[in-house]
């Protein structure tokens, strides 16, 4: 009798564990590898292993236009940054991120066939909170303030947490898109961003922020690859002068950069893709 009771209890507990286990796993917060890597020194990898792994871990980044880059992951996920529906090439993205500064950085009527639409702003004055995994990429945001335009009210001030920097973690790479950034970043922002191997930076010098300001951010991030965007008529020489001689410059004749964790340049490099 006692054995039978114990056996029944064990069976019931096992069944309960099977039900609770998946739910508990879903509630576990997603972990940022880029924040973890920022807090520890880089590990040396033998050259032979780097060469073997590079092809399998390659990410393709294509300049589409304005502030829109397409990021194609090894797992087949396509991401479109600052997606507005106008700047497109090839198949639709699986994920789109948006900033709400102007209509060229977002759309409220995206193609319904895009399964994941991520806004850089929240509702009712709240900051956006993005922490999601799609296929082989983990996507998160760091809220930033956005300029309030005089057409909206009489203040012309800033909307706290009204926009976002988006960070994409895939194939061992930390890729950041600064969006339509309107202000300098403080220590809290840099801590929340963590390590960025590749960063997409607006260099218009007016609509977002001054070239001095964005150059200071670029220097502090010290990413291996800097991809300019939102250029308009900004002379590239002026941007390069401001960010300093510690950055190399690499001007390409193609729109797509294929890169892996192990093919990042040893010297921080501004890579200017065709069309920028």
Regions found by a protein language model. Name each.
Residues 8-19:
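Bacterial N-terminal signal peptides
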Residues 148-221, 232-238:
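Active-site-proximal loop/helix segments of hydrolase catalytic cores
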Residues 1-4:
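Positively charged n-region of N-terminal signal peptides that target proteins for export
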Residues 20-148, 173-178, 197-201, 230, ...:
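Metallo-beta-lactamase
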